[in-house]
Amino acid sequence: MQLGIVTLFPEMFAAVTDHGISGRAVRLGLMNLELFNPRDYTTDKHRTVDDKPFGGGPGMLMKTEPLIASITAAREAVSQKQTIGEKARVIYLSPQGQTLKQGSIIDLAKREG
């Protein structure tokens, strides 16, 4: 299984890759996890990924450019390592999306590609 994960906090994934069942899967080569930090795809010296909300108000948004670039890089990296003809699937977790539950994960695991 090839996984490309876009995250601002790549260091927190050491717990996933170094321990437990997922760590064993990585060590046995059953799962390959590659991390992509949107800060690596910025163009300013401060590696800025935050943007202000349009129309004012509280909160912060992510800049689209580094987010799109990191998703594209992750998708290309995963696609290169998959079987010919398989296309990398993008799963974007967002507060506006559906709640990710065990049943959804089982359904995703059953899909091809």
Report residues per predicted region.
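N-terminal nucleotide/polyanion-binding subdomain common to many enzyme families
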Residues: 1-77, 82
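S-adenosyl-L-methionine/SAH cofactor-binding core of RNA-modifying enzymes
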Residues: 61-113
